C-alpha cells in the first residue's frame, strides 16, 4: 500500500487525482480494511467513484453497515454506493434512527434520496433549510436526486406547503426555473422571506413590489433586497421614511445601547431576525467606536486611583485562551472587570461599588443587572450553537469560542 501512502502522506493531504491512477481493486481492499487510518480510507473511497469493482461491493457495504467503523468512512462509502438499491431496505430500517454518530443520520437521509426514496423528502427538506451549511448541502443533494428522478412537481406535491422548509424548497425550485419569487417576501416565516430576498436580482421588479406588498414586513424585505442590489442608501432611507421608520421597540433599551448593539449585530444577524433591525441599521448612522487603548488606559487609571490594583487588560479571547469577542477583561483582586469595545460600557463579574463609582467618575457607563437582563427581541445572534435573541449583557460583552 506504499503508493496509497505516497498520495495521502498525512491527514488532509490527499491527492485524489493521484489515487485515481491506482488499481481499483487495491483501493477497494484498502477502504474495506478498518486497520488502515480512516483519513487514508476516505480519499481512497472518493478515488473509486464510478469504478467500484463488483466483487468488492458486498464487503464495502458491510463497512457501511458497521456502526463500529469510523463515520467519515461510512459517509464516503454511502456517497460511493449511492446507486446500490440493495442498501435501501437497511437505510429505511427504524434502527437507523437510533444511530447518533456525527453526520450519519444526515448521510442516511441523503442516501435514501439518492436511491429514489420519496418518503425521505420531508426530512430532506428540513435538512435543506438548516442554518448549518453542511446539513443544508446534504439535504439539497438528496432533494435534487429526487427531482432528477421524478421531476420537481412530484417532489413539490410530496412536500406540500404547510411547513416553512417546504415553502423554502418551493422558492428555490421556482428560482431555479427562472420564475419570479418576489411574492415570497410576504411569506409569514422570516427564513423563507430572507431566502426569497437573497435570490432577487432585478431592482426594477423589487421597486414595483414595494407598491403591491401586502404587509409592512414584506415592504421592509423589499427595501433590504433593493439596498443589497443597488447600495443606494438614499433610496433605502426614502423607502424607510415612507413606511414610518418602523423599528422593534425594546423597553429599557435607550438610544446609546440600541445604537451600539444595532450596528454591531444587525448586518450579520441570523436569517430569522426581524427585518426592522436590518433596515434600521441601513438607515441610521453608526456610533463612534471608542479607542480601545485609550479606554483600557482610562479604566486602569480609575481603578488604580481607587486603590484596586488592576492587572493589565487582555482581550476576551486571550482571557479564555480561544475565540474572540467584544470586550476586554481586567482583573482586580478577586474580581474581573469587563470593558466593552462597543462603547463606554463596563460591568464586573461580581458587584463592586468602589469600582463602579470610580469608573462612572471616569466617564464609563456601568451596566447593572437590570440592564444586563434586557432581552433584545427579533435580533437573532449566533451564540454557542443557538441562533436566537439574547440579552444586553451577552451583546455588549460577547465572546464566542
Predicted feature locations:
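Short, extreme N-terminal segment that most often corresponds to the first beta-strand
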Residues: 2-10, 282-285, 396-401
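Structural detector for internal amphipathic alpha-helices that build alpha-solenoid repeat scaffolds
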Residues: 2-21, 39-53, 62, 71-84, ...
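Amphipathic alpha-helical scaffolding segments comprising HEAT/armadillo-like alpha-solenoid repeats
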Residues: 2-4, 20-32, 52-65, 83-97, ...
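Long, compositionally biased non-globular segments that serve regulatory/targeting/scaffolding roles
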Residues: 23, 246, 345-349
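Short inter-helical turns and helix N-cap capping residues of alpha-solenoid HEAT/ARM repeat scaffolds
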Residues: 35-37, 67-70, 98-101, 131-132, ...
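Acidic, proline/glycine-rich low-complexity IDRs
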Residues: 134, 365-401
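Eukaryotic acidic, Ser/Thr-rich intrinsically disordered low-complexity regions
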Residues: 224-262, 266
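Extended, charge-biased low-complexity segments
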Residues: 259-367
Amino acid at each position: 500500500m506504499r503508493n496509497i501512502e505516497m498520495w495521502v502522506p498525512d491527514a488532509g493531504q490527499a491527492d485524489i487525482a493521484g489515487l485515481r491512477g491506482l488499481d481499483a481493486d487495491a483501493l477497494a481492499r484498502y477502504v474495506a480494511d478498518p486497520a488502515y487510518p480512516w483519513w487514508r480510507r476516505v480519499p481512497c473511497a472518493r478515488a473509486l467513484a464510478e469504478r467500484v469493482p463488483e466483487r468488492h461491493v458486498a464487503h464495502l457495504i458491510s463497512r457501511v453497515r458497521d456502526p463500529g467503523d469510523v463515520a467519515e468512512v461510512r459517509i464516503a462509502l454511502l456517497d460511493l454506493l449511492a446507486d446500490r438499491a440493495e442498501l435501501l431496505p437497511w437505510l429505511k430500517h427504524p434502527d437507523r434512527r437510533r444511530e447518533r454518530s456525527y453526520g450519519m443520520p444526515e448521510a442516511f437521509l441523503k442516501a435514501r434520496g439518492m436511491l429514489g426514496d420519496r418518503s425521505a423528502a420531508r426530512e430532506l427538506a428540513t435538512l435543506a433549510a438548516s442554518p448549518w451549511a453542511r446539513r443544508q448541502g446534504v439535504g439539497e443533494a438528496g432533494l435534487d436526486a429526487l427531482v432528477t428522478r421524478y421531476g420537481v412537481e412530484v417532489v413539490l406535491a410530496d412536500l406540500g406547503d404547510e411547513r416553512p422548509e417546504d415553502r423554502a424548497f418551493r422558492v428555490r425550485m421556482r428560482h431555479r426555473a427562472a420564475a419570479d419569487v418576489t411574492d415570497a417576501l410576504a411569506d409569514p416565516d422570516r427564513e423563507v422571506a430572507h431566502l426569497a430576498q437573497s435570490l432577487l436580482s432585478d431592482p426594477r421588479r423589487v421597486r414595483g413590489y414595494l407598491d403591491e406588498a401586502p404587509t409592512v414586513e414584506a415592504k421592509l424585505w423589499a427595501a433590504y433586497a433593493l439596498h443589497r442590489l443597488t447600495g443606494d442608501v438614499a433610496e433605502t432611507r426614502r423607502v424607510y421614511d415612507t413606511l414610518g421608520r418602523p423599528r422593534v421597540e425594546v423597553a429599557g433599551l435607550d438610544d446609546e445601547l440600541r445604537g451600539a448593539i444595532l450596528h454591531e449585530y444587525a448586518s450579520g444577524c441570523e436569517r430569522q431576525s426581524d427585518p426592522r433591525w436590518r433596515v434600521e441599521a441601513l438607515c441610521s448612522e453608526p456610533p463612534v467606536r471608542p479607542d480601545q487603548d485609550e479606554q483600557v488606559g482610562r479604566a486602569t487609571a480609575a481603578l488604580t486611583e481607587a486603590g484596586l490594583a488592576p492587572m493589565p487588560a487582555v482581550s476576551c479571547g486571550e482571557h479564555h485562551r480561544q475565540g474572540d469577542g467584544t470586550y476586554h477583561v481586567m482583573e482586580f483582586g478577586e474580581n474581573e472587570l469587563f470593558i466593552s469595545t462597543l462603547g463606554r460600557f463596563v460591568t464586573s463579574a461580581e458587584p463592586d461599588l468602589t469600582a463602579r463609582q470610580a469608573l462612572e467618575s471616569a466617564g464609563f457607563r456601568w451596566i447593572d443587572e437590570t440592564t444586563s437582563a434586557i432581552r433584545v427581541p427579533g435580533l437573532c445572534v449566533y451564540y454557542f450553537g443557538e441562533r436566537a435573541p439574547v440579552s444586553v449583557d451577552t451583546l455588549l460583552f460577547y465572546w464566542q469560542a
